[in-house]
Amino acid sequence: MSDYILSAEINLPLLKWMTSFKLNSNLFSTSRNQSLKSISEIYRDLQYNIIPPKDEELQNLWTHLYDLNNYYSNSIEYNQVEKSLMGLKSKYRNSYLKGYYEIINLFQSIANDFEKLSSPISQTTTTTQIPIISFNKNSVLDAINNRKNENKENSFKFLSSFESYVPTVEEIKRIYCIDNKEILIDKSCTLPVEYKLFHSFSLLNLYVYLIIVIRIIKLIGEINRQSSNASENQEILHLLKEYSLHIKSIEEFQLQLKLNNLYYQPTKKEIILKYFVEINSNNNLNNLNNNNDNNLNNNNSNNNLNNNNNSNSNFNNDNNLNSNINSNDTSISNNNSIINNNSNNSNTNNNNNNNIINNIKIFEFSEKELKYSKRYYSYNEFTLRPAELPNNSLGIETQNLIFYTTSNYNSGNSNSGSNNSNSSNNNSSSNSLINNSGGNSNSGLIPKIKFNHHRPKDINPKIVLAVYNNILSMSKVIDKKTINSMNEIIKNNNNNNNNNSNNNNNNNDEDDSDYEENEFNKEFNNQFEFGSEIIEQDKECYICRFRSEFISFCNYCKCKMICDLCSVNKVCWNCYFKVDKVSGNEQQQQQQHFIPLEVVVKLKDRKYPRLIYMLLRSYSFRDLMNTLYQDRFERDSVISPKDRFTYKLHKTKLYNFHLVLPNCKNPFQTKEIQIFDDYSLIIALRLLMNFILSNYIIDQKEVPPPPTQPSSRPQSPPTVSPLTPLNNHHHSGGSLLEHAIARNFNNNSVEVVSDDNTSGSGTGGSNSNSNTGGSYNKFNNNNNNRKNSTGSGTNSRNNNSDNEYSYNNNNNNYNNNNNNKIINNNSIVTVENPILWNIDKFILNVIESSIDIEQSLKIPSSCIETEIEPFASGGQANIYMVKHIDWPMLSNCPEGSYVFKQFIETKDSLQLEEDIEREMYEEKIYQTYKTGESVDNFKYNFSNVEQTDKKSLETLFYEEVDKLKRLQFSDYIIKMPAISDDNPNKRGMLLECATAGSLKTNLLEYRSWKLVIRFMMDICLGMIDIHKCQIIHRDLKPDNILVFENFNSSEASDENDERQREFGGLICKITDLGASIQKELVHDNNFTSTFHTDDYVPEEYGRFQYDGEKVDIYSFGCTFFEMVTKHRYQYKHPTPLHRDFLTTDFQYIPIRIKTLIASLLAEQSQRKQSFNEVYNDLQDIYKNVIPGLPDIPLSPISTNGSQFCKRCNPQK
């Protein structure tokens, strides 16, 4: 068979099918079905002739290929696929895997040859890129004719077997440590699937899994439409169900996720009824107190208080809601629900409590249906509330956000902030969940809907990238003039294009014609007849909700209103995805696409971060997947010192994007900033913030300072310019965060300041015309005073900072903290289905440590007297011998009992040079981008700075102290009696001194088999304790194993007596936990590097999928090998060398010990699973193998010396 055929993968149609979705074929390289091989496995067998294929197998293979090609020819656009893959070459480390374009061309030639070969008419030969397949023509034709029906069945077997190439749910949970913390499917994103960016590797696998099933169903539907035989259709469906190994439908796929606690969609009542009770009761009480303060007549205050206290609802196990709600009419809805609770007056008795559940009406609606409900809401009517999902079976409570609405039918009252059971009685308290925002007496005729928003609290990282859905589309703000102009534009476009679609839809999205009004919209329109009035000159961007008279329509679709920040060359995102702006033609962008992301920016002195939308460009989805999955660096290559800036051994880069910014000077041009590491991202965010500040801040009118003393009567706030964008700036995520932004150019930083909590713009509850409350912010920047007036309502929190003055209208401000559930740190929440995205794994933890250390463990540094010069050093610390300790608990210890490990800054000249160059580059590129100049001359590749470089010395110190403190219970871990942290220049820990040195210094002295195996058992017990505390050591080697004399254990046993009798009390203890890491962070690509010794780590170390415990087992195996052979191989990942030497050399080593070492140094899948297994084997060897063996030779010399062995090559 030709070498051309052997140099590529096998299946053309399936390969084209996969590449049409830009999926990585490497994801399908592991098949668990023994009878069906994957594409890569078949190719590998042919490439290396592991299993020589038989003629019959080849005939069957080509038959499958031919039939599948016929089935998929109508559903795959070959020209489009090949065009999208044009120029893409292989980026795999294994050179025998070709690029997609090369494989497609090769298979196209093979398919053409096979077509000619199988055709009885064509007898002529033509020159092709590859030779004609050399096998019997008649046998192929006979196979096709005789197995026509069987081929169809085999083809579907082959197709459905692709489900087995993706890891199972159990494997994903185990490999990626999901542990019920991630929800894996996001359905609310409106972008096409190939434009989605998943920052979760487990989600990527299940995403591929789902795509396969969807594709199968689509292919079946295509076949059904082409086939007229109904029985044949049933046969096809039967074949699919029969040979689908994991799932048969998308519904079953969702069911499987739910059964495995990977997907949970709460029911409508269990969330609403439970969390409405807590929030409503608290809000009712606060609203009651606020209204009572504003009422001149307080005769009914006690009665109202009692009634409000009775309105607390209990959600019991029988799902009954017991409450007494004092409201005229309240409607609540979450993500999929609207709840109406009706009570006639404030004195409703408890007899109606059991019947309140019957008044609940549930209307199902999705985000799409809500935004297509032909209702345009004012942005200040939308907020979000926090909520939690019910406890699952494992007792783990998932925290989330939900939507619900409240409606206040108040047709006769001019006060939108209170409800009256009697029109003449203005003293009754409002029992609505939230006060509606209305500005005048006529607004009371219009029922209002309001969403309360609460963002996750205490997001610690300074910079967070997260995939976040655009929930802003739920809060459309379009004035009547804009609606009319949009109708005219749509009508004109439809007439020009001879499009007969319905023009009654007023929404802004491209798929308006596909929307059909459902039952929800009919019911919704009947019950909620409301509208909103806004200033006509204040238009709103449909993406960021920024309102200004300078907002313009998209140049292409002429429908969407966009601002400069949210557009590219005055074109909206949806159009930019599909249209080539350079040529103006409607062509799919095959080589690159843009991904909308939100950036959560934590700036100086800001408790809550700012969310910013940005566009990221990746040249292809395939490149993105390769970036996430493949190691770009050759591990065994020698790196010179000058290449240190660009070399990172185990770091997979997540930054491969461009940030698109409009040009401040020329709005018709854009600037693209490449984001390739943390520093370039910081620069990009600074530029983005600078653009926002320079374009969107309009100087406001001077506002007089607030009164120094609170007045007894409410005062009207000063007037504010209606063009002030910050008053109406709608934050991403649908929140009502009103910002006061200030710039400080002294340190080239941008600061975003806002209230400490999300503020809902509401109205006062007084009897006069409602006045919007305000909080006045005053900031001093470069001696320039800027004053800002932002809307503040009932859901705002007072900000008591030094540079901000708060004036509360009607005493309506109260603390929201008691009502809001605390969301998990670093969590992003979507909208349509409450989906929690855990983004901790994509954040490098560079924050200062907040570990609490017991005071009893601390002693002053002045009480520790050490030698002047350290006797050892390494990493971030120097080791000093302690002479005396002036501390009551330790003063009686003899000299030489302890050492002091002092943490120091150890940056070499290269690191210092890199820091200086990086700072200069940051400033240069920032100023260059800021002025709009070109930056082509400023090319600099930052190295991915290691964890030790990013974390401060204080953080590293406290983290190691915390780990050692948790391991003090173990007799096989070095003891730490005290630490000293009062002096930053002498911060360190007191450790017991190893009087016998380390295993490295005594390697040749320990020749007794009993002593060596006993030491190995000690190390095993120490590693068991470390793994029990969920810690991975990552740097286990003879240097970090200390030997102590006169061991006295707290527990008396025969082993301890034997140790004292035969070994003189010698015991091994593990030290140096500075390289260790928490087990849950092992799979974080930000933590897969920085700490290791190449001689003692396996090849998989540093990859995303490596097992931390097995890495420690491998390091233990290397140490064991060095102890019994006295040889050390200075070679990266020396598994082959170990295996060769164990089989050919060192005949004095028992076979049982060789077998154990080989199992420790094997591949990851064949390696020992835990140290408990290793310890059991060592115990058996100690009892049954070691007795009677002679000692290890004094200087064992290898007969097959290796150039990498230090003992075989002492001159090196």
Swiss-Prot record:
Q: What is its EC number?
A: 2.7.11.1
Which annotated residues bind ATP?
Answer: 871-879, 924
* Sequence ranges of Pro residues compositional bias: 703-720
| Region Disordered, annotated ranges | 288-329, 412-439, 489-517, 703-733, 751-813
Q: Where is the composition biased (Acidic residues)?
A: 508-517
Regions annotated as coiled coil:
none
InterPro entries linked: Kinase-like_dom_sf (IPR011009), Prot_kinase_dom (IPR000719), Ser/Thr_kinase_AS (IPR008271)
Q: Which GO terms describe its cellular component?
A: membrane
- Which SMART domains does the protein's record reference? S_TKc
Catalytic positions are: 1035
Q: What class of enzyme is it?
A: transferase
User: Locations of Low complexity compositional bias?
Assistant: 489-507
Q: Which family does it belong to?
A: Belongs to the protein kinase superfamily. Ser/Thr protein kinase family.
Q: What is this protein called?
A: Probable serine/threonine-protein kinase DDB_G0284491
Lineage of the species this protein comes from: Eukaryota, Amoebozoa, Evosea, Eumycetozoa, Dictyostelia
